[in-house]
Structure formats: C-alpha cells, structure tokens
Amino acid sequence: MSLNIAKDSKKRVVIVGGGFGGLKLANKLKKSGFQVVLIDKNNYHQFPPLIYQVASAGMEPTSISFPFRKIFQHRKDFYFRMAEVRAVFPEKNMIQTSIGKAEYDYLVLAAGTTTNFFGNKHIEEEAMPMKNVSEAMGLRNALLANLERAVTCSNKQEQQELLNIVVVGGGATGVEVAGVLSE
C-alpha cells in the first residue's frame, strides 16, 4: 500500500493529526506554495468542546464531526490520507504509516492528547474516557442502558447502584458532564 501522492516541485508539509492544531495549520497553508498532506486516524475532524453533548444525547455525532475531504474539497494543494503513523525517520525525512511511507520537507506532529489517569490503575480500568465521538457514544449507551434497567428494577439498592455516576476530572469536559447529568 502507498499514500499515492505524487511528489511535485512544491515543498511538502505533512501534518499528523486533524484536531484544532492540525486543521488550523492546514488552513493557514492555503495558497502558500506548499503541498499539504494531512494524516489522521479518522477521516473527520471532531469538535472536542461539544463531545459531552454527544455523551448526554444533547447532540448527534454528525453535529460535531466534519469530514476532512469536505472541508478541503476545493484545495488543489491538499491531500488527506486516513492512516496511523507507525514510525518517524527524521534522518530520511520520512514517516511510516499504516498505509505506506510518506516523504516530507516539513513534518508537524499535532496528534492530540491522551487521557492522564495519574497512575491510578483502578480508574484507568473502570473509567470511560471521553476524548472522541466513539467514546462519547459508548458513555451515552452505557448511561441509557443503566437508566432503562433502573426503571424496571424492583430492588431499591440495585436501582440506586445503576443510577450512581462518578465523574472523575474537574476540567471543562468533567464539569460539563457533571452539569448535564445533574439536570
């Protein structure tokens, strides 16, 4: 497999990650004289500040997910490839992805964040992180399943356990989730 992008006379900027940083840079490079290649494991950009709305069923995933190809459909200097980066070879100006190798003149790593459990293995094993739409949908489905089971549960202690929710994390997402659940 290969990325199937012909090298032309323009210098190539490879951007790994289509979050806020990668998307902003790809937009800034419009008409800059560079060939821009965006690589992301998803074929869409997600709007993280509203992921809690997907988890709480306040919004659908399509409301906060925007296909890269649609965003950049009129760009002749832009290429998108859905892949994961496996290795970076700076001495060769090359990366290895899940679909092949890509050469670059400039490489920007904007792959985003990961959930920090601060070494707490119990939370890491039991928690449901919410960094993307898939995780938000998993949380939504778990919450709704527990609510449905609680409605038909005759044992009050079991019912309370099904309705007991712990939010770990006091950042923006944690506060938003706690707020929307309390409503």
Give, region by region, the residue ranges found by the protein language model.
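Beta1-alpha1 glycine-rich phosphate/pyrophosphate-binding loop at the start
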Residues: S2-F78, I165-V166, A172-E183
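FAD-binding core/adjacent interface of flavoenzyme oxidoreductases
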Residues: M1-R12, Y79-V166
